[in-house]
């Protein structure tokens, strides 16, 4: 009986793995070449204009894609009003919805109900990085949009700014991403800003931090909880609006803003990867683009699954 049960379990796992593989295989760089040939150029024009107007928007759009993919897969669930948007890691900090809505409206005007919000998010992430001087990559397409979202999963599946190295490795591993992917994707913190409430404990209580850097950050982040919680500081103090490898050099100098940044270089298993990325921009770019493609393949809805939303913030009626 035990043998039969184990065989059945093994078969189920194989089937599940095969289904996941098929879903990823259904994504294609040429998915819209016939159905909406101007989709990518239309999205790019919207994203590039938005990032040129406000550099921080590039980081916000990249973060939207990350927070989408880590919660029930890359399915645009993060764009549905409420639910995931109300989760602790997202509330009061997610931005860029209007830019995605604008891109969606522009695409709908040329190809009605053809291009998914999930694909727009994936393309927007790539175009944001490029607009800030970072590397490009081929975005695989064909995702469909979910009809549900989960605040509970957003609270459990998204990494916290207080995460340890082991917690980060485990969190990413559960999404099919290895430790190198995790360190590379953390390099997205070469752009963007963080709220005081997410780095207060680090700048006042941690010892593995450059003292001058801590003092600089304390000037705009008071010690008392509730005072200046939403005040912002750049995640990369060196080149905050350029997508480069300076983030890793900052870690070598103990100038990581978040606890979850500095744990990447603190005598642990990720130290050598951080050193490599700090000294070799090409190695970082290669690892980052590889990891972005892998992240974009997390549990996509394809074929007849889900829907193509008419409005990214709500399911079709």
Curated annotation (Swiss-Prot):
Induction of the gene: Induced by infection with the bacterial pathogen Xanthomonas oryzae pv oryzae, and wounding in mature leaves.
Protein name stated in the entry: Peroxidase 22.3
Gene Ontology terms: cellular component: extracellular region
Family under the similarity heading: Belongs to the peroxidase family. Classical plant (class III) peroxidase subfamily.
Swiss-Prot/TrEMBL cofactor(s): heme b; Ca(2+)
Top-level EC class: oxidoreductase
Reported function: Removal of H(2)O(2), oxidation of toxic reductants, biosynthesis and degradation of lignin, suberization, auxin catabolism, response to environmental stresses such as wounding, pathogen attack and oxidative stress. These functions might be dependent on each isozyme/isoform in each plant tissue.
Catalytic reaction(s) noted: H2O2 + AH2 = A + 2 H2O
Entry binding sites for substrate: 159
The organism's place on the tree of life at top rank: Eukaryota
Sugar-bearing residue positions: 112, 171, 205
E.C. no: 1.11.1.-
Positions of Ca(2+) 1 binding: 68, 71, 73, 75, 77
Keyword Hydrolase among record annotations: no
């Amino acid at each position: 009986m035990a043998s039969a049960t184990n065989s059945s379990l093994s078969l189920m796992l194989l089937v599940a793995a095969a289904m996941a593989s098929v879903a990823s295989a259904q994504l294609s760089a040429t998915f819209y070449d016939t159905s909406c040939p101007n989709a990518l150029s239309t999205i790019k024009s919207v994203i590039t204009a938005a990032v040129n107007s406000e550099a921080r928007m590039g980081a916000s759009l990249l973060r939207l894609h990350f927070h989408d993919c880590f919660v029930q897969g890359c399915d645009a669930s993060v764009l549905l009003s409420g639910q995931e948007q109300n989760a602790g890691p997202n509330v009061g900090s997610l931005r860029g919805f209007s830019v995605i809505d604008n891109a969606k409206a522009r695409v709908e005007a040329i190809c009605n109900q053809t291009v998914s919000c999930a694909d727009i998010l994936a393309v927007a992430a790539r175009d944001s990085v490029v607009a800030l001087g970072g590397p490009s990559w081929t975005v695989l397409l064909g995702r469909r949009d979910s009809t549900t979202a989960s605040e509970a999963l957003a609270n459990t599946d998204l990494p916290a700014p207080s995460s340890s190295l082991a917690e980060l490795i485990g969190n990413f591993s559960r999404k099919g991403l290895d430790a190198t992917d995790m360190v590379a994707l953390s390099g997205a913190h070469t752009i963007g800003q963080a709220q005081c409430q997410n780095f207060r404990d680090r700048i006042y209580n941690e010892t593995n931090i450059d003292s001058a850097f801590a003092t600089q950050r304390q000037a705009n982040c008071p010690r008392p909880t509730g005072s200046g919680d939403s005040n912002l500081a750049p995640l990369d103090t060196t080149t905050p609006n350029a997508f480069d490898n300076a983030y890793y050099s900052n870690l070598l100098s103990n100038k990581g803003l978040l606890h979850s940044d500095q744990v990447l270089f603190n005598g642990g298993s990720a130290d050598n990867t951080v050193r490599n990325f700090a000294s070799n921009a090409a190695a970082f770019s290669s690892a980052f683009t590889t990891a972005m493609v892998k992240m974009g393949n997390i549990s996509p809805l394809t074929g007849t699954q889900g829907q193509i939303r008419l409005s990214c913030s709500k399911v079709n009626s």
